[in-house]
Amino acid sequence: MAETSLLEAGASAASTAAALENLQVEASCSVCLEYLKEPVIIECGHNFCKACITRWWEDLERDFPCPVCRKTSRYRSLRPNRQLGSMVEIAKQLQAVKRKIRDESLCPQHHEALSLFCYEDQEAVCLICAISHTHRAHTVVPLDDATQEYKEKLQKCLEPLEQKLQEITRCKSSEEKKPGELKRLVESRRQQILREFEELHRRLDEEQQVLLSRLEEEEQDILQRLRENAAHLGDKRRDLAHLAAEVEGKCLQSGFEMLKDVKSTLEKNIPRKFGGSLSRICPRDHKALLGLVKEINRCEKVKTMEVTSVSIELEKNFSNFPRQYFALRKILKQLIADVTLDPETAHPNLVLSEDRKSVKFVETRLRDLPDTPRRFTFYPCVLATEGFTSGRHYWEVEVGDKTHWAVGVCRDSVSRKGELTPLPETGYWRVRLWNGDKYAATTTPFTPLHIKVKPKRVGIFLDYEAGTLSFYNVTDRSHIYTFTDTFTEKLWPLFYPGIRAGRKNAAPLTIRPPTDWE
């Protein structure tokens, strides 16, 4: 059977060689017997090298015969045969390949075709080698059979390679899409930032207009009081000047003349001690003059009256600005959410503080708690009493030196009773710490977070309409991670204090008011 295969292989090779030889003949010039160079075709249809047929007809002026069929043509007609020229080049290449294959497929020892394959020596051998002493006891099969066998083995090796190639191709395709996705995400975040600051500018402009209007009103009020006070002081000045002139005139009169018109000087500036000397000046009219002096002394206030002035000190809101612009601070304070813990949702191993601001894990399960639909019975966490369906909200959680915790939000419809994996796909958006130093955003798969400064307090900012949940390290004022999603349900702040490991991680999670907003 092996000999039959060898004969069939030899017949196939002979047929191929004959076809190649025929092609070489057709691509050869009948004059020079070499491959055609610049082949041209004459009237009878035969092809020759342009140089060969030109030399053949060199001394002829008419009746140009064909070197092959002797048919004559009346004109020296030479048409280039470019298609044949291309075939000649192909024939040359095939001849080179044939020569190489022939050299490689011949036994270097016996110069016979290498038509068999020796399994023991893993090499191709000729028929003479197969029956020689060297390979006589070896397993020898036709080369085509061995080729097919090894081709199947290589095919099996190729399958995992192709699978890996497809995987890498998919990965490459995915990576090539990421710049576009990144561009879209960046543009979305850019538009969000622009909207945020546009809104911030609008609110600041409104606050600025309110404050400027208030400042202008206060300015006008103070100016009005200044004008009124100036007019009043002008009137007082004129009265005092007139009185001073009259007093000076009276001082120049004799005592009798001065006392004669004393009733007209009730508004004059007469010292109180003057009353004690009246008895010596005019003893007869002493009693009457005492009454007049009382009237005069009542007008002494003209001398002692203090002149009032209008203060131009502005209100404290305008004279002392706080460290942050209070208008901006006022806007930001509106975002702070008053978050308290809901005992109806707390896992039985969690204990809440009296003010419902702290939660910690205890080893002993509380048995007197009713198993309500809202209570978590597998995942040891607790939710807030208030959820959010719109708007922007910010709260802070003190994590201290805990080694295990998670904070974030969950949607209203999450499973609370059975075993679960808290991921965005199941309705949980969280950042967590475990083993004391491993931080991650609980995406699919987890996104490791490389945090330089260990946070003692974590800030959480929810923008429901924008579909973002951002986490911040309050300790060093750095951004930790932002989830981007589409929120369609009520979202509840979530707190997971982590299980205790001996004395480690015993501290509670505590909701704290932001301390840098005042």
Swiss-Prot record:
Ranges for region Interaction with CDKN1A: 268-337, 389-518
Pathway(s): Protein modification; protein ubiquitination
Post-translational modification: Autoubiquitinated.
InterPro entries assigned to the protein according to its UniProt record, in alphabetical order: B30.2/SPRY, B30.2/SPRY_sf, Butyrophylin_SPRY, ConA-like_dom_sf, PRY, PRY/SPRY_TRIM39, SPRY_dom, TRIM/RBCC
ZnF (RING-type) residues: 29-70
Keywords assigned: Apoptosis, Coiled coil, Cytoplasm, Metal-binding, Mitochondrion, Nucleus, Transferase, Ubl conjugation, Ubl conjugation pathway, Zinc, Zinc-finger
Enzyme Commission number(s) from the entry: 2.3.2.27
Residue ranges of every copy of the B30.2/SPRY domain listed in the record: 319-514
Subcellular location: Cytoplasm, Cytosol; Mitochondrion; Nucleus
Keyword Iron-sulfur: no
Residues in coiled coil: 181-250
Catalytic activity: S-ubiquitinyl-[E2 ubiquitin-conjugating enzyme]-L-cysteine + [acceptor protein]-L-lysine = [E2 ubiquitin-conjugating enzyme]-L-cysteine + N(6)-ubiquitinyl-[acceptor protein]-L-lysine
GO CC annotations, alphabetized: cytoplasm; cytosol; mitochondrion; nucleus
Residues noted as binding Zn(2+) in the record, renumbered to the chain: 107, 110, 129, 135
Keyword Secreted in annotation: no
One GO-annotated biological process of the protein: innate immune response
Record's subunit section: Interacts with MOAP1. Interacts with CDKN1A.
Family: Belongs to the TRIM/RBCC family.
Function: E3 ubiquitin-protein ligase. May facilitate apoptosis by inhibiting APC/C-Cdh1-mediated poly-ubiquitination and subsequent proteasome-mediated degradation of the pro-apoptotic protein MOAP1. Regulates the G1/S transition of the cell cycle and DNA damage-induced G2 arrest by stabilizing CDKN1A/p21. Positively regulates CDKN1A/p21 stability by competing with DTL for CDKN1A/p21 binding, therefore disrupting DCX(DTL) E3 ubiquitin ligase complex-mediated CDKN1A/p21 ubiquitination and degradation.
Protein name: E3 ubiquitin-protein ligase TRIM39
Annotated organism of origin: Pan troglodytes (Chimpanzee)
Lineage, top ranks: Eukaryota, Metazoa, Chordata, Craniata, Vertebrata
